[in-house]
Amino acid sequence: MSIISQLSKSLPKNIVISGEENTRPFECDGLSVYKQKPLAVVLPNKLSQVKKVLEICRKNNTPIVTRGAGTGLSGGAMPIKDSVVLGLSKLTKVISINPQEQTAIVEPGVRNLAISEAADEYGLYYAPDPSSQIACTIGGNVAENAGGVHCLKYGLTVHNIESIKIMNIEGEELVFSRQDEGLGLLALMTGSEGLLGIITEITVKLTKKPEVAKLVMAGFDSVRDCANAVADIIKNGIIPAGLEMMDEFAIEASEEFARPGYPLGSKALLLCELDGSDELVSNDLETVLSLLSKASSVRVSESEEERLLLWKGRKSAFPAVGRISPDYYCMDGTIPKRHLGDVLEKINALSKHYSLRVANVFHAGDGNLHPLILYDAGVPGELEKTEEFGNEILKLCIDVGGSITGEHGVGVEKLDAMCYQYSDSELDVFHQIKAAFDPQSLLNPGKAVPSLHRCAELGNMHVHHGNLPHPELERF
């Protein structure tokens, strides 16, 4: 009996999707340049159904790719050949909210923004706010360790969860908590991209809404002056709720798309949000304004509506750029903040070298870059040129002491770059961790951690007499 027949026989027929046309919507995630149709898609609405899918796939040695809302930007939820996609988007219960403890227990398919909506009546909200928060799920956020424009002060997903439940490949439920002694397994699972287990329940930390929030918008005549302002704000002990930069191209695209009132003609834009008590915000605002002497324009939000509108422009940057070009490639690297100006200048030089336009938006407070490379996949060779450009940006991040990913994950997009960032001994550890949780390598295989052979082919791993190191390790 085929695996599709087994799934259809063991589960409600309305949650099993098969057939080439029916599975097409699941052939990629937000990184649509890479596509692969799965054997089948299962959309369980009960945890018992998740367990049954794992059981059937394990017995048939069939790979499982877990999917949330499909908003990821690294190909982490892209199916692999002959795989089953396990979509968790129907597991949408907000199980409980504890306003005293400031926590909420939710299923993995709950949307990021829906948590804040559910907690609003208690004066609480969920702080991490990726640009896709209206659609992305908390399970996907945990899998990628998502951040957002407010991560500088309030942290990434890993800083805002108390515990998670996962189901391993054997169907066994495991619980990882911030209170656990010993190894930080909660942190290990956060950002594991579906390689180690299926996230089935999350206890998130809720944050009290600030008394006051003000957003300062400053335009600059040079990117370097804007980057220097970022450094000055941090050096003066200010911890903004959000600290974002955009270059001229991103400013123009966002203004055309969302009409937030950005200063057209500026070479760079700084958005600095200050929140807390009225006294704290007033004092911090005075300090920040004194540090913006080189800004060509400065505006401070006067209402909540204005603050949200100014943020809307930044959060609309990706779709705004998407309207300008047939395709765009969104990068995600991190660098030390002191290198912001230099790195942006080098990215612009690479843009000229490859004859591809770039819009730069990034979380300036923690050095998380999001260059958007514009290209046309219909032009022969342009995708390959774009990928090469993207890899050069990631190498640049590594060269200045940064990382190849800040919040989008590795997925399939950055597998080659992993070979540049990590040594063979470090990849050895990654493979051993994967094998400890998933001995058959059925959970999202081929993602996040490159095979040793792949790195050897790239010339970043020594091969002695034709033999790869660590022959005892799995090759996937």
Enumerate the language-model features and the residues they cover.
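N-terminal flexible segment immediately upstream of the FAD-binding catalytic core
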Residues: 1-55, 72-102, 131, 206, ...
